């Protein structure tokens, strides 16, 4: 009996000690993966912060949150600029830490970086939700700074985060190599008061080989420099952003500083060092220079397209960075099309400059004078009215129809094919470009300029088309040896002789169009004239053709 009483007393004392330890902020568990340190109180969280900030970083140790906890005057876990960075694994266990206030008196000691975690290195933070209000300099909901090969997995920020410098839902800065942020969501409102940036997931990514995968921003992002998922990938950063979504409104409040704003990554200084795949924007993007996915160029995998269904409210210029887009409305701002984007313009009035590095199809629209129209990708024009020059700089372009009131040019190693359309000014070919004219109506008639302008190295071939030029000396005054004419409809025998010489071996015919007589050379030109209802009489290389029988090519 005495032994039994002694045993019971020992158990009671042990339970009493355990209860006291919990009250003092200690944890249960041994810190292994199978038996992690279990934290269930504010005091327990404070103990972790105190230990890490004093140099005990718990490398290789495991922690689990046993219940949701509210903290006040919170001291972040880990410090920027020191070795006092959490290095273990923290499992939030689906629980929520609500932060009522960050201890602002510690701002300088933490280098301005604050959140639930201030700084971690080679750590894993997972399954954690942060709520409440977070204010400070460089602040985030979950972890302000990621060093080493840290991981943030399946974390959610619901806190309102306001930074006097930078603000993020998940992390302010990726500074280590091989950092992974996966399955994270921002539902909180994120605001930055300065030009240093705000974003739903990450403000600055400057570590090498980072991965941001399956993350979503649902919160409102506002400030001078902002991004939906990521604000800035620096020139020292590299990695991939994939399977991410921005559903929140992203509003740049700055004006006059040429600011870039986008739903997924606003600024990419790394160029091809950043890959964005299978991402989408549904939110409203508002600012000076806006894009759905990324304002800067990046690397894309065509098999994993990026998409946009959100409204883009740009005041200066818009970049189309999603994989496909259709434009129907008026646009007074500049438009840039990225190399991996395929865009169709169906209608609208466009007064801003257009630069296409991707695939652009124009099925209609009016392109007002004063802006540029450059293509260095793939361009197809099926219709439209162009009161500005069209310039093919590299790549390929095909014009099937449309009204061109000023010059069309091809440069560098570009290739331009003209199958139709009405052209009121010159056709220019320079550098090592190639221009093939297979049709179209060329109404330009000049005694001072030129219809076809060829610079050394370029080549122009004419197989068809109707040309109004009368002065034989001004049709192609430069580099005539680079011009080949095998057919077409011209104003006189003199034009035909000047372009092709005598004798003309191809079929030749007179074409009467109203009170005007022209000379058609070649089967294609004769058939086109006949099929358009004009009176055609073969004069060389064939027999007389009546209008009723002119539906076949000769």
Language-model regions, residue ranges each:
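Sec-dependent, cleavable N-terminal signal peptides
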Residues: 1-23
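Extracellular adhesion/carbohydrate-binding repeat motifs centered on closely spaced tryptophans
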Residues: 318, 332-336, 351-355, 368-378, ...
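A general, composition-driven signal for non-globular sequence regions
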Residues: 7, 38-40, 218, 382, ...
């Amino acid at each position: 009996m005495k032994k039994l009483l002694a045993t019971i007393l020992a158990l009671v004392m042990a339970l009493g000690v355990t209860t006291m330890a919990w009250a003092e902020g200690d944890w249960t568990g041994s810190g292994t993966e199978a038996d992690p340190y279990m934290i269930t109180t504010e005091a327990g969280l404070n103990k972790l912060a105190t230990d890490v900030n004093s140099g005990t970083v718990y490398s290789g140790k495991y922690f689990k949150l046993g219940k949701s906890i509210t903290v006040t005057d919170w001291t972040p876990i880990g410090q920027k600029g020191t070795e006092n960075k959490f290095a273990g694994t923290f499992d939030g266990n689906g629980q929520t830490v609500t932060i009522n206030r960050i201890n602002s008196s510690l701002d300088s000691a933490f280098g301005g970086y604050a959140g639930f975690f201030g700084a971690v290195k080679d750590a894993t933070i997972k399954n954690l939700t942060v709520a409440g209000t977070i204010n400070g300099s460089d602040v985030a909901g979950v972890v302000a700074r990621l060093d080493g090969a840290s991981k943030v997995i399946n974390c959610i920020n619901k806190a309102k985060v306001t930074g006097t410098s930078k603000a993020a839902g998940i992390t302010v800065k990726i500074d280590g190599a091989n950092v992974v942020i996966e399955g994270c969501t921002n539902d909180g409102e994120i605001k930055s008061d300065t030009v240093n940036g705000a974003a739903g997931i990450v403000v600055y990514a400057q570590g090498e080989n980072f991965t941001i995968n399956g993350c979503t921003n649902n919160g409102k992002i506002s400030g001078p420099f902002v991004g939906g998922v990521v604000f800035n990938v620096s020139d020292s950063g590299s990695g991939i952003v994939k399977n991410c979504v921005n559903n929140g409104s992203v509003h740049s409040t700055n004006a006059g500083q040429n600011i870039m704003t986008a739903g997924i990554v606003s600024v990419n200084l790394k160029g091809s060092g950043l890959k964005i795949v299978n991402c989408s924007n549904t939110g409203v993007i508002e600012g000076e220079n806006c894009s759905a996915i990324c304002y800067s160029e990046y690397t894309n995998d065509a098999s994993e397209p990026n998409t946009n269904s959100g409204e883009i409210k740009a005041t200066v210029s818009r970049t189309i960075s999603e994989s496909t887009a259709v434009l129907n409305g008026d646009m007074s701002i500049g438009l840039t099309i990225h190399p991996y984007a395929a865009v169709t313009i169906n209608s609208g009035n466009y007064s801003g400059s257009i630069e296409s590095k991707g695939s652009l199809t124009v099925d209609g629209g009016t392109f007002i004078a004063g802006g540029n129209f450059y293509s260095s990708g793939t361009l197809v024009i099926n219709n439209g009215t162009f009161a500005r020059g069209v310039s093919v700089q590299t790549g390929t372009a095909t014009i099937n129809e449309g009204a061109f009131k000023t010059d069309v040019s091809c440069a560098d190693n570009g290739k331009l094919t003209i199958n139709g359309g009405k052209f009121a000014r010159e056709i220019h070919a320079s550098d090592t470009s190639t221009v093939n004219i297979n049709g179209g109506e060329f109404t330009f008639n000049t005694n001072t300029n030129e219809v076809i302008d060829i610079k050394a190295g370029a080549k122009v071939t004419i197989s068809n088309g109707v040309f109004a030029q009368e002065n034989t000396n001004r049709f192609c005054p430069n580099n005539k040896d680079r011009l080949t004419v095998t057919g077409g409809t011209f104003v006189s025998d003199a034009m035909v002789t000047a372009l092709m010489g005598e004798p003309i071996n191809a079929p030749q015919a007179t074409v009467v169009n109203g009170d005007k007589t022209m000379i058609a050379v070649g089967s294609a030109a004769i058939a086109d004239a006949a099929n358009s209802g004009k009176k055609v009489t073969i004069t060389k290389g064939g027999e007389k053709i009546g209008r009723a029988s002119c539906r076949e090519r000769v």
